[in-house]
């Protein structure tokens, strides 16, 4: 299992979802996070490697509007989540 670390931005976005009371998104984030920790390159949420200025990062769908954007560090067995609110192109 990979260890999950959240960026400050991802923490703020998770707090936003928590305060919004949207249980469907919170459940999806939990499910995706568990799946990412187990196997970061495959699984649910349509994992895909990102391109161009986001090369080296991966994305998984929370829903049509939101994505989890993360990087995988195999040497330290860690996944670093950069963001989870909005589509990565809105940043």
Residues of each region from the PLM?
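Enriched for short, Lys/Arg-rich terminal
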Residues: 3, 9-26, 59-67, 71-91
């Amino acid at each position: 299992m990979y260890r999950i670390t959240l960026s400050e931005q991802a923490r703020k976005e998770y707090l936003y979802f928590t305060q919004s009371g949207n249980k469907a998104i919170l459940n999806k984030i939990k499910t995706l996070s568990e799946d990412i920790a187990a196997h970061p390159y495959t699984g649910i949420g349509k994992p895909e490697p990102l391109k161009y200025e986001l090369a080296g990062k991966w994305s998984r769908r929370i829903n049509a509007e939101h994505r989890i954007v993360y990087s995988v560090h195999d040497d330290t067995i860690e996944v670093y989540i950069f963001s989870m609110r909005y589509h990565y192109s809105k940043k």
